[in-house]
Amino acid sequence: MCGKFTLFSEFDDIIEQFNIDQFLPEGEYHPSYNVAPSQNILTIINDGSNNRLGKLRWGLIPPCAKDEKIGYKMINARAETLAEKPSFRKPLGSKRCIIPADSFYEWKRLDPKTKIPMRIKLKSSNLFAFAGLYEKWNTLEGNLLYTCTIITIKPSELMEDIHDRMPVILTDENKKEWLNPKNTDPDYLQSLLLPYDADDMEAYQVSSLVNSPELIESH
């Protein structure tokens, strides 16, 4: 799964790397060493002409949901079953997004009683993009709430020693294809969702401190 990640890159770097044409005011971007579910997170969609940067709440709420609490159970979606699950089938065809990040965390189990936090990133330290889906939900007050989920896949060689799942990190080419609203074939879209090349990534143990620059330092 993916339950925590970081995004502390410069705002201008995000705009440039993801070819953003429309974006929220820079003052609404808050770098974080501990991006977590239920937070409003930076996301990118394509409207057919432009890449747009905005915020969606992390934890997808299907339109048919009667209670927003279901979002806490839907922070991730399995790549292999997107086309089969009612909550993900429709957004797979028409509501795809990417989530910028510069690393993510996972807990590695050493024994039945011991787990240690690991930080996983690109060796280049570059920004990358998680594959995601989004939806809109009518609240009980009649307001629209936009939410998202991060897609996971079987682990790479690097990740399999840490966890049995990993978030889908899109290559530059697949990132464009994933955002392209003209792509609607579920088989093709699912073919873009692959474990990222383990040779281009690294993982190391970090502190369990929350929302601190020290969280990303090797221990």
From Swiss-Prot:
A biological-process GO annotation: protein-DNA covalent cross-linking repair
UniProt site positions, description: Required to stabilize abasic sites: 163
UniProt note on regulation of activity: Formation and reversal of DNA-protein cross-link depends on DNA context. Catalyzes formation of the thiazolidine linkage in presence of abasic sites in single-stranded DNA. Mediates the reversal of the thiazolidine cross-link in presence of double stranded DNA.
Entry EC number(s): 4.-.-.-, 3.4.-.-
Residues the record marks as active site: 2 (nucleophile), 106
Record keywords: Covalent protein-DNA linkage, DNA damage, DNA-binding, Hydrolase, Lyase, Protease, SOS response
Site, as annotated: Required for sensing abasic sites: 106
GO molecular function: lyase activity; peptidase activity; single-stranded DNA binding
Positions of post-translational Thiazolidine linkage to a ring-opened DNA abasic site modification: 2
Keyword field contains DNA-binding: yes
Domain statement: The N-terminal catalytic Cys-2 residue forms a thiazolidine linkage to a ring-opened DNA abasic site. Glu-106 catalyzes reversal of the thiazolidine linkage; self-reversal is favoured by duplex DNA formation. Glu-106 is also involved in sensing abasic sites in single-stranded DNA (ssDNA). His-163 stabilizes the abasic sites by forming a hydrogen bond with the O4' hydroxyl group.
Function: Sensor of abasic sites in single-stranded DNA (ssDNA) required to preserve genome integrity by promoting error-free repair of abasic sites. Recognizes and binds abasic sites in ssDNA at replication forks and chemically modifies the lesion by forming a covalent cross-link with DNA: forms a stable thiazolidine linkage between a ring-opened abasic site and the alpha-amino and sulfhydryl substituents of its N-terminal catalytic cysteine residue.
Family named by the database record: Belongs to the SOS response-associated peptidase family.
Name this polypeptide is given: Abasic site processing protein YobE
